[in-house]
């Protein structure tokens, strides 16, 4: 009886802590949702979730055009115009690069791998100026296809994802490569017929990370996009902050909520594979 009582107490305490941490983590999102239905005075009156005088003005104002050239639907379309190519290029290039480093021995392999890892320690702010000058030479600034934001991802420049896939690939037995070679598969056939299907969860986790990071990216569009009609959601929310008339925080929070809805939907649809990819990639280092 003593052991059962202590186990029940431990279980209760464990779930109590988990529920408490969960509430603390989700409360800001719940508060943001409730604040979209409040006016400024009620928003700053406290941090409670209760809505005394609900209003839809925040959502009505969020759907208005700003400067006559862009609205929230156009901003969302602009966002996914570069997010989707960036995700695809990142996953494909990182997978190919990881396959090369993880499965082949070639001269200078360790040196190139160490150089690649060293780029992880370079802060993005150091690269902003040379990248800006280079893309200006190419004529990619303010491109209608947002080339300056995503084209570099086609060359496996997202080192974090290359490293993550290499760690996951170490869990794939090399016997499968040898069996595929015996069956007459080339290296690329082995990659997309054998390796890629087994990397499914890891590829999903890479795609989700890049999708969320790209949707939330503010500095990239700020540097390379200058036409208001091409602004993505990150710049559109900033554009909605009109300092002359005062901040309508319900409108700003409504825009913020709408901007993250797609990310939440995508994450919850793929969360099982996402968790599996993250955990499986950490089995071997």
What is each PLM-predicted segment?
Residues 3-285:
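A structural signal for multi-pass alpha-helical bundles of membrane permease subunits
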